[in-house]
Amino acid sequence: MEAYALTDTGRVRSMNQDYIYASPEKVGFLPDLFLVADGMGGHKAGDYASRFMVENLVVYLNHRTQLKEGIKTVNKALYEMSLEREEFQGMGCTLVAAVIEEGILYAANVGDSRLYLIHDGAIRQITRDHSYVEEMVAMGMMQRGSADYNRKKNIITRAAGIKPDIEPDFFEEELEQGDYILLCSDGLSNMVDNDTMCSIVLSEGTLKEKAVRLIAEANKRGGTDNIAVVLVKPQEGGMGSC
């Protein structure tokens, strides 16, 4: 298994509130672990929230295997921290997490940070955004990609640290040879369309080179937000084309 993680402040923001973690090696009893968190909150609160979530989840999972309980436990601790310090009030973060075991991808998410599977030359979003616009789309009240959708797509309906209890969504996918997994913050997915992401991931080069290209593409298209990328190649195999 190969993995590479990279984050960038972007071209507009002065602070990077995205936080990443990638371990293709064992983390406690887990065979591997990959995380992206996107912080929100004024001043340094968002930066603190994303870092707190990732670092404390890794610590939790070094001693336990229950990803769901880990997310819930760290969420509660983050929420309690926001109550104790005035400068942290209202802070929170998104989270997308992945574990790969014996050819199976296990993914979890809260918010609008995403996990994509690149399989057989095509890209597919595995996670579902917890956002106002996606809820409207699901109810048939909004068209994805419409002007109203684009105006309101940053309104998220679920995030870590906002409430004492949280319910992450979980997904399971069987992997095949040649597949890639991409975890990212909305700084990538809001800037770069799926076909372009797919083409970059399937292009020649190392995972590091591909991660650099993804971030460069987001910055070329405006770089209006922090950008986080975790790119994973679980197994060896040939490359297709989008």
Task: Cite the ranges covered by each PLM segment.
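PP2C/PPM-type serine/threonine phosphatase catalytic domain
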Residues: M1-C242
